[in-house]
Regions:
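C-terminal His-loop and adjacent cap/lid subdomain of alpha/beta-hydrolase
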Residues: 1-304
Length: 304
């Protein structure tokens, strides 16, 4: 319902304008120009608003939108996020280190990324008799599934800061509509001791969440509790569990898949001006999976 939430925000804005400028009230969709603007998830939200019928919306500007459609090479965020979380740490070892952005500092991460290559080879996901061949195999798999070189380079930060796993953990709960303590892979959020064990958050920590936290742990004193954490590849088992929901069987997977399907976008209503701005180097929401397919679907539906 992201699109309807945008519409509700516009209705609230009209009401707020009426209270702030009573001498010019009433403000309505008929006498007020409404342009919906958003980036990332907000970009996806304003594109979903563009689907809604009625003359309430005058134009849409979407930046780097998290949006997916039927066909045209589109992939849902959960799909490519879980893929990247598994493969990208290994694949980046096949790319010249000088071409990759820092921070994060790459040298301390390399042992973990090398362990990922070993794990993926043992699981039959990639091929290669040595580390170089395994990294090349992971790199080729990502390119074959639609990742551009620019997106892979930009994705270095997401791999290095463990953002792919953070997004996947959170979105698995959201798409599957799982409550607190019911994550199907056993993940949880908590303040943590130095040994990563969970502990209650302090009052000061809780007080900072609203102003400082991004909403997606880890960060600001909230960590990810992963019951499957184990050496030598610490996060592999948990990531394999999350990846299994993309196309796998079982009730938990079906719930996640149903949630993803419910977020699929449709073309904008006819005649509505829509501007989509998306950088080719976006490594978090690659345009090849989001904006480009959306525009192709819109044009196929007769939108200009």
């Amino acid at each position: 319902d992201w699109g309807r939430h945008v519409q509700q925000a516009a209705q609230f804005a009209l009401s707020a304008l009426g209270q702030a400028f009573p001498q010019a009230a009433p403000f309505t969709f008929d006498n007020t120009r409404v342009i919906a603007v958003g980036i990332s998830n907000g970009g996806g939200a304003v594109l979903r608003a563009a689907e809604l019928e009625g003359d309430w919306l005058d134009a849409v500007v979407a930046g780097e939108p998290n949006v997916h459609v039927d066909g045209h090479g589109s992939r849902a965020l959960y799909d490519y996020t879980t893929e990247a979380a598994l493969l990208m740490p290994c694949a980046l070892l096949d790319m010249p280190a000088a071409t990759l952005p820092q921070p994060p500092l790459l040298e301390p991460l390399q042992p973990f990324w090398q362990a990922r290559c070993t794990s993926l080879k043992a699981a039959g996901v990639i091929e290669g008799a040595d580390l170089a061949a395994q990294a090349r195999s992971a790199h080729e798999k990502l390119r074959a599934s639609g990742w551009s070189e620019q997106a892979l380079v930009a994705g270095t930060a997401s791999a290095g800061f463990d953002l792919w796993r953070a997004v996947a953990v959170t979105y698995a709960s959201a798409y599957g509509r799982h409550g607190v303590g019911a994550h199907p892979c056993g993940f949880a959020f908590s303040a943590q001791n130095p040994d990563s064990s969970p502990r209650p958050a302090t009052a000061a920590e809780r007080g900072s969440w609203w102003s400082d936290a991004s909403g997606i742990p880890p960060g600001n004193g909230v960590g990810i509790i992963d019951p499957k954490l184990a050496l030598p590849d610490l996060t592999l088992a948990g990531l394999q569990c999350l990846r299994g929901f993309h196309a796998g069987p079982g009730e938990a997977a079906q719930r996640v898949q149903a949630g993803i399907a419910a977020t699929r976008a449709l073309p904008p209503r006819a005649g509505l001006p829509v501007l989509v701005v998306h950088g080719m180097d976006d490594g978090l929401v690659p345009e090849a999976f989001s904006s480009t397919p959306y525009l192709a679907a819109a044009r196929a539906a007769g939108r200009q």
